[in-house]
């Protein structure tokens, strides 16, 4: 197994630049990415008749999903899976659904295209909505039904069998860095709560989808809040989220609900 971090194109400048609202850089980058992906397959195939073609899995974030969508449509050789997280939107006029991408299909005939968008990601929607401010209807969110991808959660939760906790994604970043409670958290993910951070639900699921094991994704028990005392001896689940493994007793209580 090998991991290639592909940075072979000009990505948009950060705000206040409006480049992220355009698809021009994504189209140009998509052409280059398609050539790279096809090159991996063809190079491996030319080495020996006894060597099987590589199993390629594409993982893309933010504007990279826009770029990857153009690449995947242009491919000559299908990849095994594609995973989009925190997407800046897909150009629906050119890519009508996940089925338009050259990605392998599961036994039921559905493309192995996985999508996730965290509810606390406030940046990705800006790219999608903002792309429509340039005089025409803009890009659409691949997490919505029109795209036909396989959606999975980034909200965190507890494994229903073991009680193990998986943290939520709390922002747009692949790797969280912001201090909890600071002004940075309006848009940035807090430390340990980025899409690819260890022990997050999103990071765990992306590890599965990008190694051909997306069928093993579980639906988790939603994260609980600590209970705070209220009037009349009552308590209410309004405290911080409990991001630790559940005790056997707590897990049994959740399983019985």
Please provide the spans of the model-predicted regions.
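Lipolytic serine-hydrolase domain surface
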Residues: 1-54, 74-257
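Gly/Ala-rich beta-loop-alpha elbow adjacent to hydrolase catalytic centers
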Residues: 59-68
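Short, hydrophobic alpha-helix immediately C-terminal to the catalytic nucleophile
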Residues: 69-73
